[in-house]
Amino acid sequence: MEGTVESQTPDLRDVEGKVGRKTPEGLLRGLRGECELGTSGALLLPGASSTGHDLGDKIMALKMELAYLRAIDVKILQQLVTLNEGIEAVRWLLEERGTLTSHCSSLTSSQYSLTGGSPGRSRRGSWDSLPDTSTTDRLDSVSIGSFLDTVAPSELDEQGPPGAPRSEMDWAKVIAGGERARTEVDVAATRLGSLRAVWKPPGERLQGGPPESPEDESAKLGFEAHWFWEQCQDDVTFL
């Protein structure tokens, strides 16, 4: 009988853990008494008239009513615990949402302060900061071409018009390449065919020899300018 009564008593350990207090013994006794009366078939609802007129019957009716009220209190307590859990869950969601909103707003403000405008501007700025290889190549070719264009005419101007006498310094500047200049002279002489270019050191030319004709002089000047331009182009490309 006692095992049946204990098994029918509701388990209030979850409620005790959530509330933090132990269930009163009076409430447990009332629940046990209600179960005992239910099993014996003598449970009376509130408001039911008692057939007995003695004092014992009245005390029993009061105990049954008290147990019924305590059972209602337990149900109300369980509903309050459930409501409290729902309120805690809603408050947690609101706090998390507020934290995320403040974090996002701080990130957005930092992004605006860094970019000085819209967020898309930072992406465009990062793409614009990447080096453009095609533009660099075009600039390099233009700079090389402009350098060669400025070097070749200046050398032609320094050498003077065809037929004019040249100094030993100008001739030494043209043949400063040494063996490379000789090779270029031989190749160009072979291509021209009709031009017989004979390379001579500056010392031999100054010591004496037959004067060259103006046509040969002008052809040599043109060839030397072309060779010097090719040499400058090779040097710049190597750099």
From Swiss-Prot:
Keywords: Cytoplasm, Leucine-rich repeat, Phosphoprotein, Repeat. Its main location: cytoplasm. InterPro entries: LURA1/LRA25, LURAP1. LRR repeats lie at residues 55-83, 93-114. Residues 107-116 have a biased composition (Low complexity). One of its GO terms (biological process) is positive regulation of canonical NF-kappaB signal transduction. It comes from the Eukaryota. The keyword Ribonucleoprotein does not apply. One of its GO terms (cellular component) is cytosol. Coiled coil: none annotated. Residues 107-139, 200-219 are annotated as: Disordered. The keyword Magnesium does not apply. It is found in: Cytoplasm. The modification Phosphoserine is found at residues 118, 126, 129, 213. It holds the Pfam family LURAP. Forms a tripartite complex with CDC42BPA/CDC42BPB and MYO18A acting as an adapter connecting both. Its binding to CDC42BPA/CDC42BPB results in their activation by abolition of their negative autoregulation. Interacts with CDC42BPA and CDC42BPB. Acts as an activator of the canonical NF-kappa-B pathway and drive the production of pro-inflammatory cytokines. Promotes the antigen (Ag)-presenting and priming function of dendritic cells via the canonical NF-kappa-B pathway. In concert with MYO18A and CDC42BPA/CDC42BPB, is involved in modulating lamellar actomyosin retrograde flow that is crucial to cell protrusion and migration. Activates CDC42BPA/CDC42BPB and targets it to actomyosin through its interaction with MYO18A, leading to MYL9/MLC2 phosphorylation and MYH9/MYH10-dependent actomyosin assembly in the lamella. PANTHER family: LEUCINE RICH ADAPTOR PROTEIN 1, LEUCINE RICH ADAPTOR PROTEIN 1-LIKE. This is Leucine rich adaptor protein 1. It comes from Homo sapiens. The gene is LURAP1.
